[in-house]
């Protein structure tokens, strides 16, 4: 089911997410919701907190759909890249963010199997962005304070919109 995206200002986006204890029907249902919502909003990645669930799960499709459960970044390259990022939870805001060019992640997939995988370039950026969501970090936290100040009116408007949003599920 396509879920509403939580916006900047929603407290769930600032909480450190809890580990998933086991992959069960509820977890599989959440994963389906994440993929459906991500595809419906033309995203390339989506973390559970973005749909109001404070669990350590995110999905990504960089040409290959993947599920990351309880991910840990175990390696970040010292080589960095700066590129523009946006976020469904911070709509219509795009800013340059510095990230590691390569990361290695240990995670559990939707079958409960432990996976260790390395990502480079754009895929590494997406993994780091979604992982940050599980830590309660948004990409706007990583931009210089002068840029945050420059876009403050936009950010304030998103927070106001978030406060007016009714997240109750409709049949």
Curated annotation (Swiss-Prot):
What terms describe the molecular function in GO for this protein? metal ion binding; peptide deformylase activity
Q: Which UniProt keywords apply?
A: Hydrolase, Iron, Metal-binding, Protein biosynthesis
State how the cofactor is bound: Binds 1 Fe(2+) ion.
State the reactions this protein catalyses.
Answer: N-terminal N-formyl-L-methionyl-[peptide] + H2O = N-terminal L-methionyl-[peptide] + formate
Q: Which InterPro entries match?
A: Peptide_deformylase, Peptide_deformylase_sf
What SUPFAM superfamilies does its record include?
Peptide deformylase (SSF56420)
Name the needed cofactors.
Answer: Fe(2+)
Q: Gene3D superfamilies of this UniProt entry?
A: Peptide deformylase
Assigned EC number:
3.5.1.88
Query: What does UniProt list as catalytic?
Result: 130
Which residues participate in Fe cation binding? 87, 129, 133
| Highest taxon, organism lineage | Bacteria
Biological process (GO) annotations held by this record are:
co-translational protein modification; translation
- Tell me, in a sentence or two, what this protein's role is: Removes the formyl group from the N-terminal Met of newly synthesized proteins. Requires at least a dipeptide for an efficient rate of reaction. N-terminal L-methionine is a prerequisite for activity but the enzyme has broad specificity at other positions.
Q: Which family does it belong to?
A: Belongs to the polypeptide deformylase family.
Spell out the HAMAP family in the cross-references: Pep_deformylase
This protein's name: Peptide deformylase
Look up and give the organism this protein is from. Answer: Pseudothermotoga lettingae (strain ATCC BAA-301 / DSM 14385 / NBRC 107922 / TMO) (Thermotoga lettingae)
Q: What is the lineage of its organism?
A: Bacteria, Thermotogati, Thermotogota, Thermotogae, Thermotogales
């Amino acid at each position: 089911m396509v879920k509403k995206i939580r916006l900047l200002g929603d407290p769930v986006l600032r909480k450190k997410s809890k580990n998933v204890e086991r992959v069960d029907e509820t977890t599989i249902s959440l994963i389906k919701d994440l993929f459906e919502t991500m595809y419906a909003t033309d995203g390339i990645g989506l973390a559970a907190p973005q749909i109001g669930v404070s669990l350590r799960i995110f999905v990504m499709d960089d040409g290959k759909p993947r599920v990351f459960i309880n991910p840990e970044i175990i390696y970040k390259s010292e080589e960095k890249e700066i590129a523009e990022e946006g976020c469904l939870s911070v709509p219509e805001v795009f800013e340059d963010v510095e990230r590691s060019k390569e990361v290695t992640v240990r995670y559990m997939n939707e079958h409960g199997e432990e996976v260790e995988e390395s990502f480079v370039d754009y895929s590494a950026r997406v993994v780091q962005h979604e992982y940050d969501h599980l830590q309660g970090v948004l990409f706007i936290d990583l931009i210089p304070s002068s840029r945050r100040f420059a876009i403050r009116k936009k950010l304030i408007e998103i927070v106001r919109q978030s406060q007016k949003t009714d997240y109750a599920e409709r049949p």
